[in-house]
Design a protein with these regions (language model features):
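S-adenosyl-L-methionine
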Residues: 1-162
Length: 162
């Protein structure tokens, strides 16, 4: 249906990633498929649910994202005369659209919770830190060492030169 992908791409999780890795031209973000999209660490969810297959938590997470993404589209459709710029103006965003996005963010966060993320995030910095850890896990041949880099850096800085 495409609603799953659209939902993840419209989420706070993806927006935080985009703001962290996208280039900029003046104050505008430059969304690059090669840098932003292709390197985005998607949640591990199945492609589709096969007939007569029991629903797993990942299938339920995918269905929740699809449903929430459709709710965002439905909320936008309530304002056919409004442009996206008008709908997403922080001062005048319709409450129904804001609520739909909040539900979408919760559904996406729940999907990431299945792969080690939190169910709620304090801020975008936490989201981005998790996404970079996930990216490292997905692209590394060896498991990521937690905290090792900080300890090594402290140890080298604290050593006296002989």
């Amino acid at each position: 249906s495409g609603h799953y992908e659209m939902g993840v791409l419209q989420s706070k999780m993806h927006m935080a990633w985009m703001r962290a890795v996208a280039g900029r031209m003046k104050s505008d973000y430059q969304y690059s498929a090669q840098i932003v999209y292709n390197n985005f660490p998607w949640p591990d969810l199945p492609e589709k649910l096969e007939p007569n297959q029991p629903q797993t938590p990942t299938h339920k997470a995918q269905a929740a994202i699809e449903k929430a993404a459709q709710a965002v589209l439905d909320a936008r459709a309530q304002f056919p005369g409004s442009s996206l710029a008008d709908l997403y103006d922080p001062l005048t965003m319709p409450p129904a659209l804001l609520k739909a996005h909040q539900k979408l963010d919760a559904a996406v966060d729940a999907a990431y919770a299945l792969v080690g993320g939190k169910k709620t995030w304090k801020n975008d910095a936490e989201r981005v830190a998790f996404l970079f850890e996930r990216y490292q896990h997905l692209t590394s041949l060896l498991p990521a060492a937690k905290g090792k880099g900080k300890e090594k850096a402290k140890g080298k800085a604290g050593r006296k030169q002989a």
